[in-house]
């Protein structure tokens, strides 16, 4: 407190006060503070990605957002350089049991301080430490998971904690220029006032039926929902049943209608009718017999081979006079399904682009066999996708286009093939559509997004490995209330690139031919030895090698000494020597031509 305490109180604001406290300071607060983009977020929406792709500079995007952006602006959202859809590289991030992204080799959880790299040729993501220790230092330029060759130029840096300048969000091109894409969901939300109202399916159908002829008919019969209509139908059925009983009082009681073999089969095996619960053991036995007589689902690519068991025809004919006598036991022929160990590849040429599909023939052989055979027969040519749900899936494979048609190559449904290796996780998963357990036909669907609730309920048999931009274009097609695309999405032609089922036959024929060729060579060797077995040993002995060469040398020396000392006895002893010499010379194995 002094007498000059208000001497610095001015009637204006100084430049320093303006820059640090007043108007100038407010403009700084409105700016986005410095922040580096996390590795698990899309560089376009700044939200966590689900189906990531990246560019050669390491910028990561969500496939569903980057494709429309490229189509509209045609440039890189971060750098502003020209960019095409072909320049996008799909990434494969691996998660641990707790759902955290980690390195699949060292099992280290990724953090904001982890140096993360991706291999361009495969798309797998690793920590740089694993690549450095196991690839760069050892000069082993093979991918650590797939063993595919790559070069050092194929390494893409996703995150480098020592260089965060390229991940500053305020420096992105789309942030500086305010570039945005028109979201269809946002348009619907702005145009439809009831978009954010969460209603059940019955209420939605009821609101859609207001003012229609169907609503008038329901009101004419008393109105109400499904429960009221079912109660009225039950009451009418009870009245009609009582009337029919009154009319049949005078008639003799009719015997209970028996089940036919086909009805019993459908009732007891599939359990789809109300009579299935009433079916007894005899009906179930008849059902099994009917299914056996109808024949099981024989794979197209199967063959009959001999088993290690006999057919039993000889024993049956020996113990029973009802069979024709058989004196020869033949091996029983059994059916062997061909389960290839390779992958299959199919391409769909659609109205919105090409889809390249990899088929897991080694894990789901029957579903893949059905799919490949239908593609080869041209079954899918000209067939449209009749159902598409955004952020879920697109369904097709029905020639009728109703979702109720289509059949398998066997003319009947085939069983599911659930496997823990194939789950509904990730974008582009191809799975069989069905109406219940073991009801697979020709219909299939492709996922836009992971759907774990479908695991072990539908058979996963493939995945999209090329054409994710085409899949994104399909997802953006508007649909009507019944999820049918307003713009036709049709399969123009289905081409089979690799069919492991036919390649299996070719490999077997090739192996069989090589085996027969080797057997012929062995037979020739055995025949030459048997007809002239001493040819090789005689030549070997003449050259001074082989077994017994020292014994032959000693015998020849002894013969020379004997000739020099016993000249007087040449008439008698010489004959015996000649015989011995002849015997010793003919000790080798020969044929019987000299006899």
UniProtKB/Swiss-Prot annotation:
Principal subcellular localisation of the protein: nucleus
Report the pathway entry.
Answer: Protein modification; protein ubiquitination
Say if the entry is tagged with keyword Transferase.
Answer: yes
Polar residues: which segments have biased composition?
A: 582-595
Q: What is its EC number?
A: 2.3.2.27, 5.2.1.8
One cellular-component annotation, GO: nucleus
The family database entries (Pfam families) matched by this protein are listed as: Pro_isomerase
Q: Where is the PPIase cyclophilin-type domain?
A: 342-496
Q: Where in the cell is it found?
A: Nucleus
Q: Which reaction is this enzyme known to catalyze? A: [protein]-peptidylproline (omega=180) = [protein]-peptidylproline (omega=0); S-ubiquitinyl-[E2 ubiquitin-conjugating enzyme]-L-cysteine + [acceptor protein]-L-lysine = [E2 ubiquitin-conjugating enzyme]-L-cysteine + N(6)-ubiquitinyl-[acceptor protein]-L-lysine
| Start and end residues of each stretch annotated as Disordered | 503-546, 576-595
Q: Would the keyword Chaperone turn up in this protein's UniProt record? A: yes
Compositional bias ranges of the Basic and acidic residues kind: 510-525
Q: Which residues form the U-box domain?
A: 35-108
Give start-end of the signal peptide: none
Alphabetized, the UniProt keywords read: Chaperone, Isomerase, Nucleus, Rotamase, Transferase, Ubl conjugation pathway
Identify the tissues in which this protein is expressed: Expressed in leaves, flower buds and stems. Lower levels of expression in roots.
Superkingdom assignment: Eukaryota
- Similarity section: Belongs to the cyclophilin-type PPIase family. PPIL2 subfamily.
The task this protein performs is described as:
May catalyze the cis-trans isomerization of proline imidic peptide bonds in oligopeptides thereby assisting the folding of proteins. May also function as a chaperone, playing a role in intracellular transport of proteins. May also have a protein ubiquitin ligase activity acting as an E3 ubiquitin protein ligase or as a ubiquitin-ubiquitin ligase promoting elongation of ubiquitin chains on proteins.
This protein is called what? Answer: Peptidyl-prolyl cis-trans isomerase CYP65
The organism's taxonomy opens as: Eukaryota, Viridiplantae, Streptophyta, Embryophyta, Tracheophyta
Which gene is this protein's source?
CYP65
């Amino acid at each position: 407190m002094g007498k000059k305490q208000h001497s610095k109180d001015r009637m204006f604001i100084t430049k320093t006060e303006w820059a640090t406290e007043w108007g100038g300071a407010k403009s700084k607060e409105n700016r986005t503070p410095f922040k580096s983009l996390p590795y698990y977020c899309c560089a376009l929406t700044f939200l966590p990605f689900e189906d990531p792709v990246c560019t050669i500079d390491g910028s990561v995007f969500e496939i569903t957002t980057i494709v429309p952006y490229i189509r509209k602006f045609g440039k890189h959202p971060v750098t502003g350089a020209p960019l095409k859809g072909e320049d996008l590289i799909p990434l494969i991030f691996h998660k641990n049991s707790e759902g955290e992204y980690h390195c699949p080799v060292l099992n280290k959880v990724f953090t904001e301080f982890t140096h993360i790299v991706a291999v361009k040729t495969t798309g797998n993501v690793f920590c740089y430490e694993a690549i450095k220790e196991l690839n760069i230092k050892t000069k082993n330029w093979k991918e650590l998971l797939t063993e595919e060759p790559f070069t050092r130029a194929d390494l893409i840096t996703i995150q480098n904690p020592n260089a965060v300048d390229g991940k500053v969000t305020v420096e992105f091109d789309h942030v500086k220029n305010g570039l945005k894409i028109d979201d269809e969901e946002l348009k619907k939300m702005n145009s439809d006032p009831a978009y954010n109202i969460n209603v059940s399916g019955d209420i939605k159908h009821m609101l859609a039926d207001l003012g229609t002829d169907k609503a008038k008919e329901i009101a004419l019969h008393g109105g109400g929902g499904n429960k009221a209509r079912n109660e009225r139908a039950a009451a009418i059925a009870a009245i009609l049943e009582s009337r029919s009983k009154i009319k049949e009082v005078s008639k003799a009681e009719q015997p209970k209608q028996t089940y036919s073999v086909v009805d019993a089969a459908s009732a007891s095996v599939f359990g789809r009718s109300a009579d299935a619960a009433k079916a007894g053991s005899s009906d179930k036995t008849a059902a099994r017999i009917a299914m056996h007589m109808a024949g099981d689902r024989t794979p197209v690519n199967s063959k009959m081979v001999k088993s290690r068991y006999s057919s039993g025809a000889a024993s049956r004919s020996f113990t029973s006079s009802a069979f024709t006598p058989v004196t020869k036991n033949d091996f029983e022929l059994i059916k062997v399904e061909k389960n290839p160990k390779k992958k299959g590849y199919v391409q769909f040429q659609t109205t919105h682009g090409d889809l390249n599909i990899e088929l897991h023939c080694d894990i789901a052989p029957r579903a893949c066999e059905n799919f490949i055979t239908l593609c080869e027969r041209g079954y899918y040519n000209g067939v449209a996708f009749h159902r598409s749900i955004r952020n879920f899936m697109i369904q097709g494979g029905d020639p009728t286009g109703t979702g109720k048609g289509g059949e398998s190559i066997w003319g009947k449904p085939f069983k599911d093939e659930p496997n823990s290796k194939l789950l509904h996780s990730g974008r582009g998963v191809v799975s069989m559509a069905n109406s219940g357990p073991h009801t697979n036909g020709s219909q299939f669907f492709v996922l836009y997004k992971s759907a774990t609730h479908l695991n072990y309920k539908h058979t996963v048999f493939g995945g999209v490995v090329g054409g994710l931009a085409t899949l994104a274009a399909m997802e953006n097609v508007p649909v009507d209330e019944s999820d049918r695309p307003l713009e036709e999405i049709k399969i123009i032609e289905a081409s089979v690139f690799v069919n492991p089922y036919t390649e299996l036959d070719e490999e077997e024929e090739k192996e069989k031919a090589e085996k027969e060729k080797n057997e012929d060579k062995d037979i020739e060797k055995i025949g030459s030895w048997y007809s002239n077995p001493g040819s090789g040993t005689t030549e070997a002995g003449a050259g001074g090698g082989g077994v017994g060469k020292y014994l032959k040398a000693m015998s020849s020396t002894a013969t020379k000494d004997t000739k020099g000392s016993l000249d007087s006895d040449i008439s008698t002893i010489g004959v015996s020597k000649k015989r011995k010499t002849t015997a010793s010379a003919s000790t080798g194995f020969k044929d019987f031509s000299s006899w």
